[in-house]
Amino acid sequence: TISSALLSMALHSKGIKARSFSASQIAIRTTSSYSKAKILDVDAKKILDVLENDTIPIITGFQGITEGGDITTLGRGGSDATAVAIAAQINANRCDIYTDVDGIFTTDPNIVSNAKKLDSITMEEMLELAGQGAKVVQTRAVEFANKYHVPVRVLSSFNDGSGTLISLKDESMENALVSGIASQKDQVKFTLHSVGDIPGTAFKILGPISEAEVEVDVIVQNVSIDGKTDFTFTVSNEDQETVKKILSVIKDEINYKELIINPDIAKVSLVGAGMRSQSG
């Protein structure tokens, strides 16, 4: 909120009309999950009124309000999601997101020095990259862009350049076997050994975890032997204690024989629309 006010003052000093807004002033409505809230709706009327008066609206990008008027925060990358949601509501032709990098790269340039910048990438591929650990654009921002058909361009705040365009369809990328590689560290693998292989078991395990706003990533269920199976899934390390408590509570209902926890694992993912049509 302070930053948006300061930016507004800086623009005024340059003779540019601007006005800062908090989430409550704009009515960015979210779920009530503090620090992990999800945007439900954005009231675009006030934004459009300001734009019609040739004034630049500057909006805090990581906040929201519940139906009851309580302030929430959107978590890491929440400003990306806010920007795309607002762009969708005001029918913008495109949403530009300025970051500390020059665009979307084939992999993390901080890890691989010869990573190449992509001129364009499809929404589908960007969703996969973001979901598998690429941190340039937040996953929910790409989901909004895909749902409301808002092209997104990722640009550098520090360097001039064309950045990377995230579009609904990019003909030049369709034949690319692999368009990017993403990695996620600090993952935890949970394995419930010898779970009853009966309908509804997965829901009984994952349902309470979902209600706790924990995102489950990889899910693997082994082939059943004598009516028993091993159920494995991964979550972020920051959610480890929450998941442990949940599995302890439902142990008698699920009736698993043993809980095996493997912390500090990493995942590497290859993403590319071209792999869909490739064998092997």
Question: Could you describe each region identified by the protein language model?
Answer:
Residues 21-23, 155-157, 219:
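Conserved beta-strand termini and adjacent loop/short-helix elements that scaffold enzyme active sites
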Residues 1-142, 222, 234, 260:
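Nucleotide/pyrophosphate-binding catalytic subdomain
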Residues 59-60, 92, 128-186:
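Phosphate/diphosphate-binding glycine-rich loops and adjacent basic-rich segments that engage nucleotide
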Residues 14, 148, 212:
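Conserved dinucleotide-binding and phosphotransfer motif residues
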Residues 163-280:
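A conserved regulatory-domain signal marking ACT and ACT-like small-molecule sensing domains
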Residues 94-98, 152-154, 217:
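Short hydrophobic alpha-helical runs that function as membrane-insertion/retention elements
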